[in-house]
Amino acid sequence: MKIEMICTGEEVLSGQIVDTNAAWAANALMDHGIEMQQRITVGDRLDDLVEVFRQRSEHADVILVNGGLGPTSDDMSSEAMAIAKGEPLVECTLWRERIQEWFTRNGRHMPESNLKQAMLPASAIMVDNPVGTACGFRVKLNRAWLFFTPGVPFEFKKMVTEQFIPFVEQIADSHIEVEVQKLLTIGQGESALADKLEGMPLPDGMTLGYRSFMPYIEIKLFARGEAAIGELDRVKAEVLTRLGDAVVGHNVASLAQVIHNGLLASGKRLSIAESCTGGMIANNLVAFAGSSNYLDQGLVTYSNESKVRVLGVKPATLDDHGAVSIATVEEMAKGARGLLDSDYALATSGIAGPDGGSEAKPVGTVAIALATRQGVYSQMLKFPARSRELVRQLSTAVALDMLRRELQESPVLVDYSSYPRFAR
């Protein structure tokens, strides 16, 4: 089965917004054993939309169309589909009532323009959008089913998950059982990981892939069919053996998720004192509901004065070693932990750039410490200085990994081949 995606919108085509919907959809489909063969982006021009609907419907079996279902003049997907099919737009009474109910329920007057969202090609089959006013629908043209979804990300994701993927699985010629295992890694480049996995035999029906999304590289094992699935645990164990300390999570999207789960399970509490990461560590954790059960505080102690007055860092430590030093982050971590008697505290201080570096401590130099009730672990690393954001992301990842290792009773300090460690 050949599956494609058509993304619509002038702002997407011109690069004014990043098309996160397309990337998310391709990954979600892959997790279900569904591979997308092609993706096309088209602006808000009626003739171009009509042409691409007609053209791609002769080559694909299923086309996921995203965007252009709103109430404004530049939302043209329904009209373009009707023209491509050679049929009129007709009002979907059920959806008109749904829109009216939505506005009434939210205590708002419905603008006349919203009625446009109930106008569908005559042969369209309505696809429910339970969280918005844009009506989804599907239409058969030539060999393809075109499946229309709104551009609003949370509406799109819900419809793809609950409507589109089940539809594709239903019309597929045969359903092959699929299982995916994902291993999250940090600290090694994609080529280094590939070298370690080079020559590892894979059984028929199993593939291995890489996905880089800073600060992580995800290793994905994809098994199709009962025989390949039966070998998945064995192959995964071999990958873990070959990659060793690089693997920091299993079937999770981030290290923060690992820490969240680990702290909830342990009943331990955490404080954070951040300088160069500027609240990024805390932000990663509070994204998860329930983080209040373990997060005592997140402090951004950016200035030397705040390090001294809030965390109790000794002025002499700053004078002798500087703000970016193992001595300073150790005192930051101890001070943060002591404020509320937390079980753990993380601290960061570094040079995120683009300025501020020196020969001894170039841009990308970051000191990180983890304080526990038993003592303090610390290290100073040199991260790639390609951007300020990257330095902060990598610093956050290593800090969280140090805590992960402590929670899992593993050695807290390990070598990351991509991030050289300064001598103490």
Swiss-Prot record:
SMART domains named in the record: MoCF_biosynth
Family: Belongs to the CinA family.
Matches recorded under Pfam families: CinA, MoCF_biosynth
Domain of life: Bacteria
Signal peptide: none
InterPro entries, per database record: CinA (IPR050101), CinA-like_C (IPR036653), CinA_C (IPR008136), Competence-induced_CinA (IPR008135), MoaB/Mog-like_dom_sf (IPR036425), MoaB/Mog_dom (IPR001453)
Source organism (scientific name): Shewanella loihica (strain ATCC BAA-1088 / PV-4)
The protein's name: CinA-like protein
